[in-house]
From Swiss-Prot:
Family to which this protein belongs: Belongs to the D-glutamate cyclase family.
InterPro entries given in the database record: D-Glu_cyclase, Putative_hydro-lyase, UPF0317
NCBIfam families for this protein: PRK05463.1 (NF003969)
Protein name: Putative hydro-lyase Rxyl_2409
Pfam families in UniProt: D-Glu_cyclase (PF07286)
Organism, scientific name: Rubrobacter xylanophilus (strain DSM 9941 / JCM 11954 / NBRC 16129 / PRD-1)
Length: 259
């Protein structure tokens, strides 16, 4: 049996048949990061995304009170179609549920942001390995010392994901990922994690540590977990996001986002 399409993948998630990370799920379909917050903070967050397009490439904003992403997946329900969510109350992580039906309110607005899984498939097609996939782990993510451009209550550090490559592979990784600006685009830094304030690659803030192969160096991309780091600092009464690595599968094809 072939890989499930986007709608089938979401149905499996909704039924609880797929509860883990979504890397490799529904190949060829773009996946998205999710941030949900009250309408009173939506304009500030929209400005935050516009001011920080590398970590927060905006794909869609839903109508207030609607869990349906009409552009990316008109038959979906953002309350149930992500394998795992994170619920923050006043900056504290309070819950990681499999659905957010009990949490849903009529004033909530959903933001869907580009995800690096799209350019990861392009990296594989270009003959570049993905260490975290080979090692059966979620991609490692790190909070950096770079600050995002603030908007209202939203201010905080840039979060990056890391994939290791040999120095001669880096130009290819840069050129391939740069073709997907709506999915974080080209790397923000190559080598020297200490330049980003990262003290230990073996202790990521999100995801899992990966083993670097001989001669490999770390390559860092802006990451859609950045809004979670920002949510911790914003201290809003309620912010809901996807759990790292547990994305929303859209009906849009990866190829639609290549430039």
């Amino acid at each position: 049996m072939g890989a499930p399409g986007a709608a089938e993948a979401r149905e499996r998630i909704r039924r609880g048949e797929h509860a883990g990370p979504t890397a490799g799920l529904a190949p060829g379909y773009a996946q998205a990061n999710l941030v949900i917050l009250p309408e009173e903070h939506a304009l500030d967050f929209l400005r935050f995304c516009v001011r920080n397009p590398k970590p927060c490439p905006l794909l869609e904003v839903t109508d207030t009170g609607s869990p349906v992403p009409r552009t990316l997946a008109p038959g979906a329900d953002l309350r149930t179609d992500v394998p795992r969510y994170r619920v923050y109350e006043r900056g504290k992580l309070v819950e990681e549920p499999a659905d957010i039906l009990p949490r849903w309110r009529g004033d909530l607005v959903c933001f869907l942001l580009g995800c690096s899984f799209t350019f990861e498939r392009a990296l594989l097609a270009a003959g570049l390995r993905l260490a975290h996939v080979e090692q059966g782990r979620n991609v490692p993510m790190y909070v950096t010392n770079r600050r995002c451009a603030p908007s209202g209550p939203f201010a905080g550090p840039l979060v990056v994901s890391m994939r290791p490559y040999r120095p001669e592979e880096v130009p290819r990784a840069v050129s391939v990922s740069a073709r997907y600006p709506a999915m974080h685009g080209a790397p923000v830094h190559v080598g020297r994690p200490e330049a980003l304030g990262i003290k230990d690659l073996g202790r990521p803030d999100f995801g899992d540590a990966v083993i670097l192969g001989e001669g490999e160096i770390p390559v860092f991309w802006a990451c859609g977990v950045t809004p979670q780091a920002v949510a911790l600092q914003a201290g809003l009464p309620l912010v809901i996001t996807h759990s790292p690595g547990h994305m929303f599968v859209t009906d849009r094809r990866d190829a639609e986002y290549e430039v």
